[in-house]
């Protein structure tokens, strides 16, 4: 298994350098690309928050779901600021003394938010379908309470699914400052390397 783990890590490292051969181009993409994403993303999502906080929309399940989706997007953008600074501005690993803890927090939160956002979008589609297909059941099924329950269930599953990233024995800094492999398995000889780089990519 150690041989498999080492081969997996070597392959991932080689692929990373193939994907990012030009550091200057990578820096430009992160600095200006993410900067543009932040500008559009923050302004658009804050506008959504203002819209769905209105008295008329916030009493509807659909309005609550869109509000939570905007909040999730804002949190995801905030977490991405670290990569913007590390790769696009400083161009090397930052906060190295606590890098392992930052890795665990960032990767767990990014996975958690992506999972929840995907399910919130699914719940919005289901909510709209129920309102169209069963209009007489709208007041019973499409409520804020049910929306919160559905999102809470998705959040619990997201925590369980991504909890391995919070383990200080398994996850931490790998190659600080290198996109896609800045964080990863701490012990490069453990079976977790194969799980994270191969099996986890399929699971998530």
PLM ranges: what are they?
Residues 23-35, 62-123, 131-134, 138-139:
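Extracellular TM2-ECL1-early TM3 structural module of rhodopsin-like
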Residues 30-37, 64, 106, 145-151, ...:
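Transmembrane alpha-helices of multi-pass eukaryotic membrane proteins
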């Amino acid at each position: 298994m150690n041989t498999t783990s080492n081969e997996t890590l070597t392959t991932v490292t080689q692929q990373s350098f193939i994907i990012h051969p030009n550091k200057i181009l990578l820096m430009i993409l992160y600095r200006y690309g993410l900067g543009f994403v932040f500008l559009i993303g923050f302004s658009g999502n804050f506008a959504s928050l203002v819209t769905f906080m209105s008295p008329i929309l916030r009493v509807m399940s659909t309005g609550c779901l869109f509000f939570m989706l905007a909040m999730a997007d804002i949190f995801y953008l905030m977490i991405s600021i670290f990569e913007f600074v590390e790769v696009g501005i400083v161009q090397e690993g930052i906060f190295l003394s606590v890098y392992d803890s930052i890795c665990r927090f960032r990767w767990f939160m990014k996975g958690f938010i992506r999972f929840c956002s995907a399910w919130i979008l699914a719940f919005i589609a289901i909510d709209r379908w129920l309102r169209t297909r069963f209009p007489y059941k709208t007041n019973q099924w499409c409520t804020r309470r049910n929306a919160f329950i559905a999102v809470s269930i998705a959040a619990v599953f997201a925590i369980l699914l991504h909890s391995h990233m919070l383990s200080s024995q398994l996850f931490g800094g790998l190659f600080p400052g290198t996109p896609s492999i800045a964080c990863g398995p701490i012990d490069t000889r453990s079976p977790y390397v194969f799980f994270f780089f191969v099996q986890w990519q399929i699971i998530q």
